[in-house]
């Protein structure tokens, strides 16, 4: 079928258990973000903007909404006869099917898919990070270094480095050691979970890893250390833009709040590197005569009759009279009644907040699940009814 130079494989099967009720019915990459996107839109858009048009999306946990969102890949120009986007659930063989056992096993189960295109390189991506990145530049770096593997890295604060997989490098960015969440890190170059491998080399390591019954079948824990031990040439590609792992409630809330900063590094208004998504046609937003909106993202289809400060309102959100929303993320089609106070909260899709409620104002980020109804006069603080 091919001789495609590079194939992208997006690992999108994560449950996202640390996101609590937000991922109760959908995979983490399908979680809404930034008013009109889902997390998966970022790696898909990065692929399209980088000219990579053969993409596999490896799904597993609660894939229905994610599959429906991606569809045939039209918003990302991935609806193609040759290549395009393919949804890849765990592989079913004659002896029966298995869940993906780890990130490496997920790619191993799809060797046949990649081989159809006979690529020289394969790009491995996580489906649950928010960032904009030109993968073509990373591929050029990989070629220049004549590497077996190139790993995207980003500098993190030294006091946070022990939370990440850390790459220890020489001056030429060649990697001599990988440490998974070290107690005393030697470096602050954190792995972004973005890898470019020479496909023939990776395929050999995937097969060896699968044959090792003691392996956890993970890129960070098994494949990368194994390649390093064998003397493979591995280099770190430094990335200096905005990047956030939105795997927790706090980081998801913060990433949305980052969009409201005047020096926002993600810049979703950049026409040279657009983030594409599947968006229904909605009427223009309506801001009532007594409404007050400051430093907020208000997406089309919203009706605002109250006060909105430093918040992100997704499509179709309704805000009642005398209601105050502050430092919050209100997801698609949520209905907020009159005389409500919401502060530092994430309100899920289609949630209904009846009038006279108080949600938030405590130390924790308040969460209301998708389609949940909060009854009239309820008070919720630190995720407990008061």
Swiss-Prot record:
Transmembrane spans: none
Record Gene3D superfamilies: Hexapeptide repeat proteins, Spore Coat Polysaccharide Biosynthesis Protein SpsA, Chain A
Catalytic activity: alpha-D-glucose 1-phosphate + ATP + H(+) = ADP-alpha-D-glucose + diphosphate
InterPro entries in the record: ADP-Glc_PPase (IPR011831), ADP_Glu_pyroP_CS (IPR005836), GlgC_bac (IPR023049), GlmU/GlgC-like_hexapep (IPR056818), NTP_transferase_dom (IPR005835), Nucleotide-diphossugar_trans (IPR029044), Trimer_LpxA-like_sf (IPR011004)
Pfam families, per database record: Hexapep_GlmU, NTP_transferase
Catalytic EC class: transferase
Presence of keyword rRNA processing: no
Keyword annotations from UniProtKB, A to Z: ATP-binding, Carbohydrate metabolism, Glycogen biosynthesis, Glycogen metabolism, Nucleotide-binding, Nucleotidyltransferase, Transferase
Pathway(s) annotated for this protein in UniProt: Glycan biosynthesis; glycogen biosynthesis
MF terms in GO: ATP binding; glucose-1-phosphate adenylyltransferase activity
EC number: 2.7.7.27
Gene Ontology annotations of biological process type: glycogen biosynthetic process
Subunit structure: Homotetramer.
Role summary: Involved in the biosynthesis of ADP-glucose, a building block required for the elongation reactions to produce glycogen. Catalyzes the reaction between ATP and alpha-D-glucose 1-phosphate (G1P) to produce pyrophosphate and ADP-Glc.
Protein name per UniProt: Glucose-1-phosphate adenylyltransferase
